[in-house]
UniProtKB/Swiss-Prot annotation:
Similarity-based family: Belongs to the tetrahydrofolate dehydrogenase/cyclohydrolase family.
EC number: 1.5.1.5, 3.5.4.9
Functional description taken from the UniProt entry: Catalyzes the oxidation of 5,10-methylenetetrahydrofolate to 5,10-methenyltetrahydrofolate and then the hydrolysis of 5,10-methenyltetrahydrofolate to 10-formyltetrahydrofolate.
InterPro entries xref list: Aminoacid_DH-like_N_sf, NAD(P)-bd_dom_sf, THF_DH/CycHdrlase, THF_DH/CycHdrlase_cat_dom, THF_DH/CycHdrlase_NAD-bd_dom
Species in which this protein is naturally found: Desulforamulus reducens (strain ATCC BAA-1160 / DSM 100696 / MI-1) (Desulfotomaculum reducens)
Protein name: Bifunctional protein FolD
Catalytic activity reported: (6R)-5,10-methylene-5,6,7,8-tetrahydrofolate + NADP(+) = (6R)-5,10-methenyltetrahydrofolate + NADPH; (6R)-5,10-methenyltetrahydrofolate + H2O = (6R)-10-formyltetrahydrofolate + H(+)
GO MF entry, a single one: methenyltetrahydrofolate cyclohydrolase activity
Pathway(s) where this gene product acts: One-carbon metabolism; tetrahydrofolate interconversion
Residues noted as binding NADP(+) in the record, renumbered to the chain: 164-166, 189, 230
Subunit annotation: Homodimer.
């Protein structure tokens, strides 16, 4: 019988670990704080900020929202970020996306302190991820591997096919999987005969955002399938994988929703705590 990799269950365990780590920090006089910067009033961003506030406060992380108008100049946003960089009581900074068209996302991300970059998207963190250094990792690729490891699935020596080469999931996932001693193949939208490669995989991780991309005839019996794709259709969130068909062949599979996405918020909060350790290290 196919094993369903329950992201919600793993997220619950991670939340308890997070709470215990926060208790330990508070005993040392450290109150973890996350600052969120939101430009404009994008409904999905506003809703996520409210959700994040609830999750943060339930875990014991202080939360503050800095909401700026949609017309705020890029220079003003950068000034706000640099102010937060200088405040020692702020340990993590999250820049909500999307940004207005007049704002350069790359410029903004480059101004967030890499030690407070809970998204793990600063060039410093990207570089250290590639070189194997200590840094903050992006939450979604971390979630993909965490689900596997916490489910008792060995990564070392396995052939992992990553489908997707995006900056936030696919690319970092490749180097994170290599660090786990997996053999990694990368496929993407221009790959010819995608199934030729996925059929060779022990583990498939898809992060494209295209419904039905991974079908049953594209995997070998006994493969593990992790679906990190997100697509909204008729008010429902669906992934890249033809779940009902693939689960009949796969040894293990993540559902959407209830899989990879269930872990991302708590893993981002864990980055706040990891950032604290890095910040303390630079002060000593």
């Amino acid at each position: 019988m196919t094993k369903i990799l329950d992201g919600k269950k793993i997220a619950s365990i991670l939340r308890e670990e997070l709470k215990q780590d926060i208790i330990t920090l508070k005993e040392r006089g450290i109150e973890p704080k996350l600052a969120v910067v939101l430009v404009g009033e994008d409904p999905a961003s506003v809703a996520y900020a409210k959700f994040l506030q609830k999750v943060s406060e339930n875990a014991g992380v202080l939360f503050e929202l800095h909401q700026l108008s949609k017309s705020t100049a890029e220079e003003e946003i950068i000034c706000k970020i640099e102010d937060l960089n200088q405040i020692q009581a702020v340990h993590g900074i999250l820049m909500m996306m999307p940004l207005p068209p007049h704002v350069n996302k790359q410029h903004i991300m480059e101004h967030i302190s890499p030690l407070k970059d809970v998204d793990g998207l600063h060039p410093f963190n990207r570089g250290h991820l590639i070189s194997g250094g200590i840094c903050l990792h992006p939450a979604t690729p971390t979630s993909c591997l965490e689900i596997l490891k916490r489910s008792g699935i060995t990564l070392a020596g396995k052939h992992i096919v990553v489908v997707g080469r995006g900056e936030t999931v696919g690319k970092p996932l490749v180097f994170m999987a290599l660090a786990e001693n997996a053999t990694v193949t990368v496929c993407h939208s221009r790959t010819v005969d995608l199934g030729k490669f996925t059929k060779q995989a022990d583990i498939i991780i898809s992060a494209v955002g295209k419904p039905g991309l991974i079908t049953a005839d594209m995997i070998k019996p006994g493969a593990v399938v992790v679906d990190a794709g997100i697509h909204e259709e008729a008010g429902n969130i669906i992934g890249d994988v033809d779940y009902e068909q693939v689960k009949e062949i796969a040894e293990a599979i993540t559902p959407v929703p209830g899989g990879v996405g269930s872990l991302t918020t708590v893993l981002m909060l864990k980055n706040v705590l990891k950032g604290i350790q890095l910040q303390i290290g630079t002060q000593e």
